């Protein structure tokens, strides 16, 4: 069993055990990849609706992309309960921002940096929020897309992906993304990435949502499925090249 | 104002609903040397009269940079002003650090006002004895605010505080309607002319005033002596009715010694009219 020795008053071993159990050690219910791109009018973000419990695809109706304030979208992979906690923090933040009622509002850049501070500080206390977050938004005509990991690594880019998306989707995006994609082309590109993830990521399910954010606001699509093709000839006799295997 | 039995504590109301200690704090602001602020849609200019304790000492700093997009000019107890400037810098930098974005000046002045209000409601504290002219930017452009020891704050197109500020205010009242659309250069000129009003007879020299500017796409900075003198030269050449005869000719540096009577600026401000701010 791996334990960290947290240097506190050594006389009370019961208290040490309690403190250990308060920290996040491993995730339980997790979401898989998020893929997001900047396009002509703003940002598009795609995710499936699955929540895995280890290797079981247990929950199939989890929204992993949410609108934040007027100008931003937040997508998360990793521990779902930590994502809900983050949504509560952001709720408080945007509420206080609205209460000022002074014509100033938090844009995607501010929220991204706030989240970076939160994630990094939690990591420093050895109690991370077990998520990789994607923050996209539009404010005053400028699109913004950034990412924060559970250890506080944070950056901006024209296209981002989390988890398996980094390995399977980013190469496609590096080849095929270009500035000023139309909405239709953007969706097609995201669907291409999501299809590859569906085929190859074991924790992906075939029920996805694509969210769009523009200067006008946020729209999250209804859940839908991708068409898949399983009739490849090699699937008919998969062991043709290696007799005896399964 | 005269002494009365309700003015010992800040936590004592008078029967007419006044807090005298707070009002006395506002008097302290009127004793400080003048500070002036003006703003246009995109720029804010803060200017002040340099006052020195004696001829031997250097003058006190009255304008502080809070951030690239916020500056503050103070009048009154400069020690209180220094402490509050440090608070403002701290708030500003903490916001920048967390959000990577400049703190909107409107929110900063509310924090400042709330801080001042606390001192009007604790028996073991005293109100800050300094008035602050805060100029800064937020999403909707340039703003100028005045923060009072009472914990109130107001937004202004142009304002002046400190001794003989009424003269400057009279000048500003005549011209403020044009400020919103003014160019930066005109705004600076108006600020220096307003400073001249508070000097009431003393020759206006660049060594007597400090001027600072900030704007959209222009971080807070001070104007150097040369630039100020250049602006002074543009209007000191034109003799106006208010000016004393014999002053204000076309000399680039004002003649020393011939500055006339009333040379001292700082001490003995009993001639300050008890005006309402």
UniProtKB/Swiss-Prot annotation, chain B:
* Record keywords: Acetylation, Cytoplasm, Isopeptide bond, Nucleus, Proteasome, Ubl conjugation
Q: Provide the Gene Ontology terms for cellular component.
A: cytosol; nucleus; plasmodesma; proteasome complex; proteasome core complex, alpha-subunit complex
Q: Does the keyword Cytoplasm apply?
A: yes
Specify residue ranges for compositional bias: Gly residues: 259-268
Q: Which SUPFAM superfamilies match?
A: N-terminal nucleophile aminohydrolases (Ntn hydrolases) (SSF56235)
Example of a GO biological process term: ubiquitin-dependent protein catabolic process
* Pfam families listed in its UniProt record: Proteasome (PF00227), Proteasome_A_N (PF10584)
- Cross-link Glycyl lysine isopeptide (Lys-Gly) (interchain with G-Cter in ubiquitin) position reads 51
User: Which residues are modified to N-acetylmethionine?
Assistant: 1
Q: Where is this region: Disordered?
A: 237-277
Compartments it resides in:
Cytoplasm; Nucleus
Q: What is its main location?
A: cytoplasm
The phenotype of cells or organisms lacking this gene is: Do not show arsenic tolerance phenotype.
Q: Which SMART domains match?
A: Proteasome_A_N
Output compositional bias ranges, type Acidic residues.
239-252
Which PANTHER family does the UniProt record give?
Answer: PROTEASOME SUBUNIT ALPHA/BETA (PTHR11599)
Protein task: The proteasome is a multicatalytic proteinase complex which is characterized by its ability to cleave peptides with Arg, Phe, Tyr, Leu, and Glu adjacent to the leaving group at neutral or slightly basic pH. The proteasome has an ATP-dependent proteolytic activity. May play a role in thiol biosynthesis and arsenic tolerance in association with PAF1/ARS5.
Quaternary structure and interacting proteins, as annotated: Component of the 20S core complex of the 26S proteasome. The 26S proteasome is composed of a core protease (CP), known as the 20S proteasome, capped at one or both ends by the 19S regulatory particle (RP/PA700). The 20S proteasome core is composed of 28 subunits that are arranged in four stacked rings, resulting in a barrel-shaped structure. The two end rings are each formed by seven alpha subunits, and the two central rings are each formed by seven beta subunits. The catalytic chamber with the active sites is on the inside of the barrel.
| Family per similarity comment | Belongs to the peptidase T1A family.
Q: Per its record, how is this protein called by name?
A: Proteasome subunit alpha type-1-B
Protein species of origin: Arabidopsis thaliana
- What's the encoding gene here? PAF2
């Amino acid at each position: 069993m791996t334990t960290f020795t947290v240097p506190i008053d050594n006389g009370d071993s019961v208290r040490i055990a309690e403190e250990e159990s308060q920290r996040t050690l491993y995730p339980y219910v997790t979401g898989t990849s998020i893929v997001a791109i900047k396009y002509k009018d703003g940002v598009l973000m795609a995710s499936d609706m699955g929540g895995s419990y280890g290797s079981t695809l247990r929950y199939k109706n989890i929204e992993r992309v949410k609108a934040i304030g007027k100008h931003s979208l937040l997508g998360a992979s990793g521990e779902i309960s930590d994502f809900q906690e983050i949504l509560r923090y952001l709720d408080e933040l945007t509420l206080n921002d609205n209460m000022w009622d002074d014509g100033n509002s938090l844009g995607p850049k501010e929220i991204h940096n706030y989240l970076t501070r939160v994630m990094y500080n939690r990591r420093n206390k050895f109690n991370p929020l077990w998520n990789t977050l994607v923050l996209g938004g539009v404010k005053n005509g400028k699109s913004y897309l950034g990412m924060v990991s559970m250890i506080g690594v944070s950056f901006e880019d024209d296209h981002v992906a989390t988890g398996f998306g980094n390995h399977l989707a980013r190469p496609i995006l590096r080849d095929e993304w270009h500035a000023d994609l139309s909405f239709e082309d953007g969706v097609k590109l995201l669907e291409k990435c999501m299809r590859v993830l569906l085929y190859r990521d074991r924790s992906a399910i075939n029920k996805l949502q694509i969210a769009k954010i523009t200067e006008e606001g946020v729209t999250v699509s209804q859940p839908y499925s991708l068409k898949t093709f399983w009739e490849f000839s090699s699937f008919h006799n998969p062991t043709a090249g290696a007799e005896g295997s399964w | 104002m005269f002494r009365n039995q309700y003015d010992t504590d800040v936590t004592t109301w008078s029967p007419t609903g006044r807090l005298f200690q707070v009002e006395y704090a506002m008097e302290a602001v009127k004793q400080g040397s003048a500070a002036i602020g003006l703003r246009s849609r995109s720029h804010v200019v803060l200017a002040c009269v340099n006052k020195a304790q004696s001829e031997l000492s250097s003058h006190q700093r009255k304008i502080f940079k809070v951030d690239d997009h916020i500056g503050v000019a103070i009048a009154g107890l400069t020690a209180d002003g220094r402490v509050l400037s440090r608070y403002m810098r701290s708030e500003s930098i903490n916001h920048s650090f967390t959000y990577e974005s400049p703190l909107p000046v409107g929110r900063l002045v509310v924090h400042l006002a709330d801080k001042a209000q606390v001192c009007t409601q604790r028996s073991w504290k005293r109100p800050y004895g300094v008035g602050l002219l805060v100029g800064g930017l937020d999403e909707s452009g340039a703003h100028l605010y005045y923060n009072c020891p009472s914990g109130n704050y107001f937004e202004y197109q142009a304002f002046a505080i400190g001794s003989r500020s009424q003269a400057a205010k009279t000048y500003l009242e005549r011209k403020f309607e044009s400020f919103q659309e003014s160019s930066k250069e005109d705004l600076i000129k108006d600020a220096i002319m307003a400073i001249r009003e508070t000097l009431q007879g003393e020759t206006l020299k660049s060594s007597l005033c400090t001027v600072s500017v900030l704007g959209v796409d222009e971080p807070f900075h001070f104007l150097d002596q040369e630039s100020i003198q250049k602006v002074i030269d543009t209007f000191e050449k034109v003799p106006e009715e208010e000016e004393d005869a014999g002053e204000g000719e076309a000399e680039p540096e004002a003649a020393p010694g011939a500055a006339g009577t009333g040379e001292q600026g700082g001490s003995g401000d009993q001639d300050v009219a008890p005006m309402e701010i």
